[in-house]
Amino acid sequence: KRLNKVLTYINNTDKLVDVGCDHGYLAIEAINKGVKLVQLVDNKTMPLDCAKHNLEKLNRLQDVEVIFTLASGLTKIDDRINVATICGMGGDLIAQIIEESFVKAKALDSLILQANTKVEHLRLYLINKGFTIIDESFIKDKNKYYPIIVAKYSGAVSKLTSTQIKYGPIILIKKEDDFIDYLNDRLVHLNNILYHT
């Protein structure tokens, strides 16, 4: 479900880099969607080898350019790349990846980010560094909740309230079902604390 949601933010004309490529599943689905240039980046050889193995099974590779890169974050991305996905990491690590390659990050058309932890830290970093949050989603996947942030550099420092930083300015507007479920779960949890302590 998370993967499918991330894919909705990728167009078939995009040139994609997937940072922290895991098994290459996102790249495979992006290629199936029509993306013609995919770069998979990881700082460990095992995930890259696993991704290579999985991508070799694809029939459509003859008209697709796939680049495998052993590197940290966005440091060695191809100059043609216009969209980056950085998913399944802590928000502090995602912020660090962007900071380490700030010039490259701000030149991209969009950063599609999915942090497992420290999402508030990531939002604060983005807005303080001149990135605008252009879209967000909130997904429940295998009984865990995940916000997805789409950001683009604008140079403008956005002003967000503490509630917007905590939950996401666009997530609060969209009020998706999974977000409502999350708030209800939190309410039950907080009530349990209140009445059992």
PLM regions with names:
Residues 76, 92-197:
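Class I S-adenosyl-L-methionine
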Residues 46:
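Conserved Rossmann-like nucleotide-cofactor binding loop
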Residues 81-88:
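Short SAM/SAH-binding signature in class I
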Residues 13-22:
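Conserved class I S-adenosyl-L-methionine
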Residues 37-42:
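Conserved SAM-binding motif I beta-strand of class I
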Residues 49-78:
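S-adenosyl-L-methionine
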Residues 1-14:
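Conserved alpha-helix/loop element of class I SAM-dependent methyltransferases that forms part
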Residues 24, 28:
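Glycine-rich SAM-binding Motif I of class I
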